[in-house]
Regions:
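Short, surface-exposed, charged amphipathic helix/loop patches that serve as local interaction elements
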Residues: 2-113
Length: 113
């Protein structure tokens, strides 16, 4: 477990990346995936979806955007459809929704966690 200071330092360094711990780990190529890094979507990635749909939690829009926003590992749409638990899709979608908030709102959310 990390201390509050470590969490704040990590957030200061990686403001545009959030590590999502999965409720239901899965395997890709024999490697167990327990967490996924979700990064802030670029404008190019956001052109593929309606922002209102993302903010409303539309699963199709979230699954369209996630392959463009996941790293370590990068997940494909097919992997999202077949391997990832719906709860984990929602967790990753929540990370994206948080990135789309103003920094002041993101700071308040971070303090509440």
């Amino acid at each position: 477990m990390q201390t509050q200071e470590q969490i704040e330092n990590l957030q200061a360094i990686q403001q545009d990346v959030e590590i999502v711990d999965l409720d239901s780990p899965f395997k890709i190529g024999g490697q167990e995936i327990k967490s996924v890094e979700v990064r802030k979507p670029s404008v190019i990635a956001l052109r593929k979806v309606r922002i209102a749909d993302i903010l409303n939690g539309d699963v199709n829009s979230i699954c369209t955007l996630l392959p463009l926003c996941t790293t370590n590992p990068t997940l494909t749409k097919q992997q999202l459809d077949t391997l990832v638990d719906p709860v984990d899709i929602i967790q990753m979608g929540s990370a994206i929704i948080t990135f789309l908030q103003p920094k002041s709102v993101r700071a308040e959310i971070a303090l509440q966690q």
